[in-house]
């Protein structure tokens, strides 16, 4: 990223962009169009909405945390009618509940479903394949739109095979690039709906960005240094191999869960997500009993050890913390983080089972033999 800017109209920048758009197809696992935006995840949410919806369209939001709800709030501000299929911060979306709601919508009034594959507030992972299967089984024409900000590049995502219509992500998590880039992918079905969408705006518009001139790909000057960084990050991912990347995330997530499982024996802290199969491989949300103050633990880890834990969000705010294990991360980083948390629990006399970090080490030692 520490390099001079180059000509944005011809030469290496053009071929670089072409390579990125093609490699984003590999990441989303789609033959559909891919788009690069100078934006964060919230920006690319808006890109997705404005390219396929019109004012007054009805949107169904699948609740499993905070971020699909935020996406729905954005749709409401754009003039859409928003309905929330109520869920829980502690469990995944139930595909059968989605199907039941769509079966009640005989006139296909619901135009889009908004769902997060992983909600970073709750730590819930949703089974997008099962949700898509449930939707298609109803025969409903609704578009399935997926927030993959906290999942793409960390776990399987099969856009075409599963039947996802629109998917979005950002640069700063699994794609290992500083914040500032957003990405969208669109199925042929979504592109057909796009042609009659009433919320289209010049900057986000897919048709404009498919223009022949390189200028069109970014609707102006590209954020070149971020684009250079993305190229390097994708090269790292493909060198490691996507299957190996996914395995690394599974192992480090399970090591984290082994530690928390031991700490939970003290009955003061534990997992937010109740079902083990619904706990994500990119972030783990930890909740504490009501009388336990978690801020001193967060402060201790940051101020004494330089480890920044994610604060709890949404309905969990002030009630816990989050440990991320996604993107450019390895065993020493995770084990070090777990060790610091365990130190903090001991220093602050927060009841916990002893040996959580050791349990994580033991798990990894068996999972990754010599």
Residue spans for each PLM region:
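Conserved PLP-anchoring active-site segment centered on the Schiff-base-forming lysine
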Residues: 53-69
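Active-site phosphate-binding strand-loop segment of PLP-dependent enzymes
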Residues: 93-153
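Conserved active-site segment immediately N-terminal to the catalytic lysine
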Residues: 160-172
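Active-site C-terminal subdomain of aminotransferase-like
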Residues: 172-262, 370
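PLP-dependent enzyme catalytic core of the Aspartate aminotransferase-like
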Residues: 315, 319-370
